[in-house]
Each structure stands twice: as structure tokens, then as C-alpha cells.
Amino acid sequence: MKIVHLVLSESFAGIEQHVDEVLTNFSSHKLILICNESIASYFDKRINIYKVKNFGRRSFFGKYKLKKLIKDIDPDIVHTHGSKTSSIISSIKTKNYKHVATIHGVKKNKKIYEKADLIIGVSDKALEGINHETICINNWWHPKLKKIQNKNNKYALAVGRLEKVKGFDLLIASWKNICANLVIIGSGKERNKLNELIEQNNLSEKVKIIDAVKKEELLNYYQDASVLIISSRDEGGPRVALE
């Protein structure tokens, strides 16, 4: 069976790591990844990857090229991750393949997923309110990550996409009265706003934002942290907490 996983994120975070682990640990089928060229280098080198330029869910040209690429690959299943990819595939799908969609968080608008043949949720909460065939597969803990033993803890750590849902603005604003350093690791469209918030609150000596790093480097940050903070406004099944 030939399965295409579709990820059109602009940054490599929890969803993308989830897909990377699926593709590198399930060898019984022919697995293929279509992703934005900006994040392709973060995935395991053994994965068969087709790179595409980033495009919006309403881009006629972007959807036309994607539809042609999928037709050339000729998969049995297209597995989408996130609302953007699910919406796009629902609008271009043919009868030649099945559409499986995974919901990785708590979403307000779940109707866009209901055109898929099967919906997977990372938690029961993520699947609430969906009137369709669903299955819950909880996020997992990767066995290669070792228990942290470092006692020389240096800072508080937060990890995730720099988007409003992750609540980093709330975390930064609350840090004014805390006498400790905070490291936020991630990339995304809220970066400039968060940096401005750090400056406005005179926190540049205590709070630092670091671009998304690869898994091996992220483990070093975990080992040097005294505490992990999850400030999300909503979470379906936080991988960072499992790590």
C-alpha cells in the first residue's frame, strides 16, 4: 500500500515531529512525504520526500500543482495533518485514493475534517463534536529520549510554534515578577510581536527566543532546564509534555 503524508507547515514543530516518527517507524507500507521545502531538511534523510513551495489553502495554482503531483505518485491513501492540508485535499480529492485526516489539537471549526474518509484525533478532546467515523490514537513518547539527570539547571524552558494558541504572550507578560531566566524555543508568525513584548517589559536580560532546533539539539536544552512550562490556550495532546 502506498501512503502519502501531507504537511504544509512553515515551521518544524510537534505535528512535523509526529509525522517524522510515523514515517521512520512504520515500514510495512510504502510511505511518502509531501511538505514545504522550508522544513524538508528537518525530516529523517531516509524518508522519500517531495518538496513544494508554500501556498495558501485558496491558491488555485498551488492546489493544481499539488493535485498533479498526487496523481503522478498515485497513492492508495493521502494522510493530511492539520486543518490547512485537510481543507486543501477535501477540495481537490479524486476517487482514486482515500483521505485520512489527523487532528493534532483542539479546533473550533471541525467541519473541514468531516469530508475525509477517516478522522484520527490525538485525544478524545480533539474529536469532540465530530459527526463522522473517528479513531483516537494518543500521542506517544519516543523511547530514544533518555531521562534527564542533569542537576545544574539553568533556566525555565518553553517549546512550541510561535503562534497565539501557544500562549507565549501570556508567559512573557507574567515573567516580569519572576527572578529566573526563560528560554522559548520555536519559530512562527508571532516572533516579532513576542520580541516587542519582551522589550516593552524590559525582559531582554531574562527572556530569550531561540529559533526551532533539531531534535538532538533540543535534548540539550531539556537537560539544562529546571522546569518545562506549557502556556497553551488550547492543547490536544502536547508532545512536549510527553518528552
Question: What is the meaning of each model-derived region?
Answer:
Residues 4, 141, 148-166, 172-179, ...:
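Conserved donor-binding/catalytic core segment of Leloir-type glycosyltransferases
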Residues 5-62, 69:
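N-terminal strand-loop element at the rim of the active site
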Residues 70, 212-213, 220-225:
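Short alpha-helical donor nucleotide-sugar binding micro-motif in glycosyltransferases
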Residues 80-86, 103:
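Short His-centered aromatic/hydrophobic patch
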Residues 115-146:
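Donor nucleotide-sugar binding/catalytic pocket of nucleotide-sugar-dependent glycosyltransferases
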Residues 195-213:
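Nucleotide-activated donor-binding/catalytic signature segment of Leloir-type glycosyltransferases, i.e.
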Residues 228-229:
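A short hydrophobic beta-strand element within the catalytic core of glycosyltransferases
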Residues 233:
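Aromatic "clamp/platform" in nucleotide-sugar-dependent glycosyltransferases that forms part
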